[in-house]
């Protein structure tokens, strides 16, 4: 299905947010996700199903020092 991910259209296989983060190869504990304008708690990812045309912003947290 096609989603808008960080402002760019992208074809993905994932059916929910948790699977999408895994498909993208991001560490599950180090990502923040906004789905159609709503920030999601980590516990909501497996329950948040994706649909054609959904808009997501995924931010990878990186610590520095």
Model-based region annotation:
Residues 1-64:
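Ubiquitin-like/PB1-type beta-grasp interaction modules and other compact soluble beta-rich domains
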């Amino acid at each position: 299905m096609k989603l808008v991910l960080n402002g760019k259209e992208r074809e993905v296989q994932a059916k929910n947010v948790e699977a999408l983060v895994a498909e993208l190869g991001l560490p599950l504990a180090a990502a923040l996700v906004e789905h159609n304008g709503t920030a999601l708690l980590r516990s909501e990812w497996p329950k948040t199903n994706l649909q054609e045309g959904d808009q997501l912003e995924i931010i990878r947290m990186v610590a520095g020092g």
